[in-house]
Structure formats: structure tokens, C-alpha cells
Amino acid sequence: DLVALSGAHTIGQAR
């Protein structure tokens, strides 16, 4: 579940 967490984190961080 690292990919899912990383993806969400990346989007939130980028936003």
C-alpha cells in the first residue's frame, strides 16, 4: 500500500 499512500501524498503536496 506504499504506492497508494505515496500517490495521495504527492498530489496533496503538489497541490
Curated annotation (Swiss-Prot):
GO MF terms held by the record: heme binding; lactoperoxidase activity; metal ion binding
Family annotation (InterPro entries): Haem_peroxidase_sf, Peroxidases_heam-ligand_BS
Residues given in the record as Ca(2+) binding sites: 10
PROSITE patterns: PEROXIDASE_1
Co-factor(s): Ca(2+); heme b
Chief location of this protein within or outside the cell: secreted
UniProt catalytic activity: 2 a phenolic donor + H2O2 = 2 a phenolic radical donor + 2 H2O
One GO biological process term: response to oxidative stress
Alphabetically ordered keywords of this record: Calcium, Cell wall, Heme, Hydrogen peroxide, Iron, Metal-binding, Oxidoreductase, Peroxidase, Secreted
Cofactor mode of binding and number, as noted: Binds 2 calcium ions per subunit. Binds 1 heme b (iron(II)-protoporphyrin IX) group per subunit.
GO cellular component, one term: extracellular region
Function: Removal of H(2)O(2), oxidation of toxic reductants, biosynthesis and degradation of lignin, suberization, auxin catabolism, response to environmental stresses such as wounding, pathogen attack and oxidative stress. These functions might be dependent on each isozyme/isoform in each plant tissue.
Protein family (similarity comment): Belongs to the peroxidase family. Classical plant (class III) peroxidase subfamily.
Name of the protein this chain belongs to: Peroxidase 2
